[in-house]
């Protein structure tokens, strides 16, 4: 084996072992202190829920914060293909590929397609302590696949990925340090947004960085070893190889597009005001929104105020609507039909309803599931 390659293998093995050891040890201590819930108790309010995450820039980061990383992944793949035939850029080909693979494999496959789907950790807003319906699970505690997609944080990976620019240390230490700072800073911002929105714990964000770092180490030291390509000369590529590369790149671009489309953040808010007749003696809500998603407040208002927030992930062009209709029976029962409708594909959707009702209906309110 080439001594240089052997050296990379050894360095990679040591770094990966240390990296995972630090992450596992820190997580054990973190869980012991119950730090995830301690922090979230300072953010969540029984009265206002996760309202801190509704403001800016947190909403903007949730809806659009992943776009820069997706765009750079596209550009890196195309740059890698062009660099294969460019004497000026040939030495950077493995660097371009390193970024692309770290993004596609680390963020796309390991985090979003594997860990989030199969670890079964409920999001903070889904656990009983914070107004949800499920049992809390600590980081690295496996749950029921599909019952929660909190671990790790997908949005956070799209911030931390920029730290992979540290690979340019041999060419420009300032660029490498700047990229590292950008990645850690942007990843922290994305993490804060998701924390305030009740979508993730601190440990979810911590492990997003952990997975991205481990993926980067594996590709850098065991697979690509970019510095060894600095002296490589441009070689003529056969038409057959070109077509294979084009097909491979196209497949990767399709994969990126699918991952982006199905993990595209979605948020919609509806408010409905329902007038209540003086003859109304009882309110019957007939709805397809589960009872555990309703937060009812009896206040000094003259009418019924309904606020519904729908958030999750949706395919482009998908949308959400809310139909509300009323009917007063001769017995004084006002039936309010609340029908939540989705159009398109939603890999994940959470609905939360805040209902303000006149005090006179405090013991005269019932909820009936809407028949399928």
What function would you assign to each model-found segment?
Residues 93-105, 238-265:
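Internal/C-terminal transmembrane anchor helices
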Residues 38, 87, 91-181:
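Membrane-interface loops
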Residues 2-3, 45, 77-95:
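Membrane-helix interface linkers and caps
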Residues 23-27, 105-110, 185-195, 257:
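Aromatic-anchored segments of alpha-helical transmembrane domains
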């Amino acid at each position: 084996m080439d001594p240089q390659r052997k050296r990379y293998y050894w360095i990679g093995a040591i770094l990966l072992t240390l990296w995972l050891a630090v992450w596992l040890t820190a997580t054990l201590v973190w869980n012991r202190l119950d730090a995830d819930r301690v922090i979230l108790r300072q953010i969540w309010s029984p009265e206002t829920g996760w309202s801190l995450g509704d403001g800016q820039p947190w909403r903007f980061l949730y809806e659009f914060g992943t776009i820069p990383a997706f765009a750079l992944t596209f550009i890196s793949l195309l740059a890698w293909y062009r660099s294969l035939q460019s004497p000026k850029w040939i030495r950077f080909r493995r660097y371009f590929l390193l970024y692309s693979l770290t993004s596609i494999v680390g963020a796309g496959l390991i985090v979003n397609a594997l860990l989030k789907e199969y670890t079964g950790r409920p999001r903070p807003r889904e656990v009983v302590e914070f107004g949800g319906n499920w049992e809390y699970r600590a980081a690295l505690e496996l749950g029921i696949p599909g019952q929660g997609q909190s671990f790790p944080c997908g949005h956070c990976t799209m911030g931390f990925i920029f730290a992979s620019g540290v690979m340019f240390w041999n060419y420009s230490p300032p660029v490498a340090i700047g990229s590292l700072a950008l990645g850690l800073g942007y990843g922290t911002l994305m993490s804060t947004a998701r924390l305030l929105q009740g979508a993730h714990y601190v440990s979810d964000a911590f492990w997003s960085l952990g997975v991205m770092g481990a993926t980067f180490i594996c590709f850098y030291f065991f697979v690509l070893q970019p510095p060894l390509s600095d002296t490589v000369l441009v070689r003529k590529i056969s038409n057959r190889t070109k077509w294979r590369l084009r097909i491979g790149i196209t497949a990767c671009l399709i994969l990126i597009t699918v991952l982006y489309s199905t993990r595209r953040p979605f948020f919609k808010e509806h408010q409905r005001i329902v007038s209540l007749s003086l003859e109304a003696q009882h309110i019957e809500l007939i709805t397809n929104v589960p009872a555990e998603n309703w937060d009812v407040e009896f206040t000094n208002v003259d009418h019924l105020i309904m606020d519904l927030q729908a958030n999750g992930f949706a395919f482009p062009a998908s949308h959400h609507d809310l139909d509300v209709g009323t009917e007063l029976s001769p017995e004084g029962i006002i039936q309010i039909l609340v029908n939540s409708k989705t159009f398109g594909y939603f890999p994940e959707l959470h609905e939360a309803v805040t209902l303000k009702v006149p005090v006179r209906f405090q013991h005269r309110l019932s909820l009936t599931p809407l028949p399928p």
